[in-house]
Curated annotation (Swiss-Prot):
CDD domains: RPS2. Transmembrane segments: none annotated. GO terms for biological process: translation. This is Small ribosomal subunit protein uS2c. It is found in: Plastid, Chloroplast. GO terms for molecular function: structural constituent of ribosome. Coiled coil: none annotated. Belongs to the universal ribosomal protein uS2 family. GO terms for cellular component: chloroplast; mitochondrial small ribosomal subunit. It comes from Physcomitrium patens (Spreading-leaved earth moss). The keyword Chloroplast applies. Its main location: plastid. Keywords: Chloroplast, Plastid, Ribonucleoprotein, Ribosomal protein.
Length: 236
């Protein structure tokens, strides 16, 4: 698919503040080729580069989802958490938006057991079994359920390792990125001017702090996922 099909509009990106980087003194020199200029001590990203890599990411996601591949979106910073949840639910993706638990991918067998525990407790809650238990035991199990729902609710239906992982903030989610590298799982990552683009398969140069920027990029990525899935259903 060509870039045009994703309706990537430079003016819209500017309105969303996608082009604003960090203070120039905090930059990572590896981001030099993605930076357009510096204004008042702030680096400005080259949106032509952003459009190019975003288009590439959308192509990959559309193709993957048309083949039934699973996508995980990770964004636990407060600016991104609710945006990640809503975009993921809309596109029927898995997501982590509270805290990355170490080993979430590299120790998947343990996470699988926790997910089973989560489902068992949810079932007991729905069927009223929890309320039939002694108060102390019921309270303990309900606390467990609250914690499991908070941290694992977004991957409740993930039955295997994801095929592609989308990362919202490279520095915040470095543990997740390292786990993906270890397992050879392809990553798509928003990279601000203080990031290392070499750590991800498809770096998307973008403001990873502003909600409007995160929302705009997420909308494009999840639209590609939904479109890929829709095209798959259409051709069946």
């Amino acid at each position: 698919m060509k870039q045009k099909s994703w309706n990537i509009n430079l003016e819209e990106m500017m309105q969303a503040g996608v082009h604003f980087g960090h203070q120039a003194r905090k930059w990572n020199p590896k981001m030099a080729s993605y930076i357009f200029t510096e204004r008042k001590g702030i680096h400005i990203l080259n949106l032509t580069q952003t459009a190019r890599f975003l288009s590439e990411a959308c192509d990959l996601l559309a193709n993957a989802s048309s083949k039934g591949k699973q996508v995980l979106i990770v964004g636990t910073k407060y600016q991104a958490a609710d945006l990640v949840a809503s975009a993921s639910i809309k596109a029927r993706c898995h997501y982590i938006n509270q805290k990355w638990l170490g080993g979430m991918l590299t120790n998947w067998s343990t996470i699988e057991k926790r997910l089973q525990r989560f489902k068992d407790l949810e079932n007991k809650e729905k069927t009223g079994v929890l309320n039939q238990l002694p108060k102390k035991e019921a309270a303990t199990l309900k606390r467990q359920l609250v914690q499991l729902r908070k941290y694992l609710g977004g991957i409740k239906y993930m039955t295997s390792l994801p095929d592609i992982v989308i990362i919202i903030d490279q520095q915040k989610e470095i543990t997740a990125i390292n786990e993906c590298i270890t397992l050879g799982i392809p990553t798509i990552c928003l990279v601000d001017t203080d990031c290392d683009p070499d750590l991800t398969d498809i770096p998307i140069p973008a403001n990873d702090d502003a909600r409007a920027s995160i929302r705009w990029i997420l909308n494009k990525l999840t639209l590609a996922i939904s479109e890929g899935r829709y095209n798959s259903i259409k051709t069946e």
